[in-house]
Amino acid sequence: MRNMKAIFIKQIRSMIKNPLLIGQGIMFIIMIVVMTFLMSPDRECDVCIPAYVCETCLRENPIHSLPSPTIAGMFSVMFMGMVMIGSSSALVQEDKTTHNLRFMTMSGMKPYQYLIGTASALFLVAVSLLFFYALAGRYFGLDTLRFLLLTGSGALVSILFGIAMGLSKMPAIATPISILFGFGPMFSNFNENMARWLHFTYTQQVNLAIYHLDDGLQQRPFLIIGATGLLTLIAFVWMHRKGELRW
């Protein structure tokens, strides 16, 4: 317990000294606020379009039948998928390059202690930032809790994935994977084939669940998020036993 607490405090200090994660999170919040004001709906134009025109467009272009993304939802998924995976991996790689990880291992630290301590610190920062994402997206009351539950659980999976990639022998693979999980759901809003391919990824499930947030939380997104997190933990344990992790 003492080791996990020390790792937690150490990682919080590292993120304050090198505030890349916090800076990117704040940048996305500002973009949500700005784009919300710039992309206000044109109600007069919507009213003047005859109903038969909309039906014809849906038949000819099925992309319009996909759920319309919310601005807060898009940037939240980008932060949760791309930024959290990249930042988690970078934080672990920093510990490796500065030899802090080796010193902690020599002092008796266990792999699960490092995983829990680091993941807890990253999760605290992520949820704190996601709270302001909810406010910027105008999610209040119960919707705020639903939003945080969805994005927070997705962020936790990204953190676990990033830590595992950062400790692996190929940490560079975290970058293309984070781009896929971060930008994939955004592009899937405008491409039916991509939406079909990414349907069972945890970031896409969060993206769809945010769109239907007013209808309440469904069980399916959490099943996919939980299954992804479990597979990540299993992969972490397997890589550790096979000696694929570099401490």
Q: Locations of the language-model features?
A:
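Aromatic- and glycine-rich beta-strand/loop motifs that create alpha-glucan
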Residues: M1-F28
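Short hydrophobic, aromatic-rich alpha-helical segments embedded in or entering the lipid bilayer
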Residues: R2-A6, F190-L223
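Junction motif at the cytosolic side of a transmembrane helix
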Residues: Q11, M15, G226-W247
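Long, hydrophobic alpha-helical segments
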Residues: M31, M35, S40, P67-L91
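Transmembrane helix segments
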Residues: V34-E44, M165-Q204
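Hydrophobic/aromatic residues in alpha-helical transmembrane segments
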Residues: G81-S88, F132, L160-A164, A235-F236
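Transmembrane helix boundary and interhelical loop/hinge segments in multi-pass membrane proteins
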Residues: I85-S107
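Alpha-helical transmembrane segments and their short interhelical loops
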Residues: P111-Y112, T118-K169
